[in-house]
């Protein structure tokens, strides 16, 4: 059954809308992917706030005109799928890299991060990076650690004095008795 021109226009408009919202995308291809594996991939991409579409190459090129994804979808051949997000590109890359390792029939064609086309090797490097949340927590720790150490040192002086006084009282060195002989 042939797809009507109206349906193609509708698909192109929806893709254009999605591509304009997306800052990051990973273009892939697959061979002999089963329905259950495709569903698994879509579910994984949705779990990190992304969208996944299998698209015709010409429709993808038309839809991507004037968007950040335009350079990544130029001149595509074969079966093409696009996973895109306006959220964290690291999470998307992690999900797709894990899926590609588990399913050799899925391969990367191109990637876009913040509107810049990245190499295929960079997709794996992106997947190995910590997520934004992990980076924020590490940064917060690095910022708070010196202040925490300062408070510990400041408290140590008072604590050490209290320990010395307590030991003196326990050994009765501070009892108002006679002075030691000189």
From Swiss-Prot:
One of its GO terms (molecular function) is large ribosomal subunit rRNA binding. It comes from the Bacteria. Keywords: Ribonucleoprotein, Ribosomal protein, RNA-binding, rRNA-binding. GO terms for cellular component: ribonucleoprotein complex; ribosome. One of its GO terms (biological process) is translation. InterPro entries: Ribosomal_uL10, Ribosomal_uL10-like_sf, Ribosomal_uL10_bac, Ribosomal_uL10_bac_type. Pfam families: Ribosomal_L10. Part of the ribosomal stalk of the 50S ribosomal subunit. The N-terminus interacts with L11 and the large rRNA to form the base of the stalk. The C-terminus forms an elongated spine to which L12 dimers bind in a sequential fashion forming a multimeric L10(L12)X complex. Forms part of the ribosomal stalk, playing a central role in the interaction of the ribosome with GTP-bound translation factors. HAMAP family: Ribosomal_uL10. Belongs to the universal ribosomal protein uL10 family. This is Large ribosomal subunit protein uL10. It comes from Koribacter versatilis (strain Ellin345).
């Amino acid at each position: 059954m042939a797809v009507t021109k109206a349906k193609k226009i509708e698909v192109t408009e929806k893709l254009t809308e999605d591509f304009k919202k997306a800052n990051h995308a990973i273009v892939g291809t697959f061979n002999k992917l089963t329905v259950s594996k495709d569903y698994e991939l879509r579910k994984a991409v949705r779990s990190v706030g992304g969208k996944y579409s299998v698209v015709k190459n010409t429709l993808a090129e038309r839809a991507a005109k004037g968007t950040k994804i335009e350079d990544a979808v130029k001149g595509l051949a074969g079966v093409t799928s696009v996973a895109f997000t306006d959220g964290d590109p690291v999470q998307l890359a992690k999900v797709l890299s894990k899926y590609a390792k588990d399913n050799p029939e899925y391969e990367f064609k191109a990637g876009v991060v913040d509107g810049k086309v990245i190499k295929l090797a960079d997709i794996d490097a992106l997947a190995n990076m910590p997520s934004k949340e992990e980076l924020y927590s590490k940064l917060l720790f690095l910022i708070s650690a010196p202040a925490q150490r300062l408070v510990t040192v400041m408290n140590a002086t008072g604590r050490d004095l209290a320990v010395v006084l307590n030991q003196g009282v326990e050994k009765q060195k501070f009892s108002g008795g006679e002075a030691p002989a000189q």
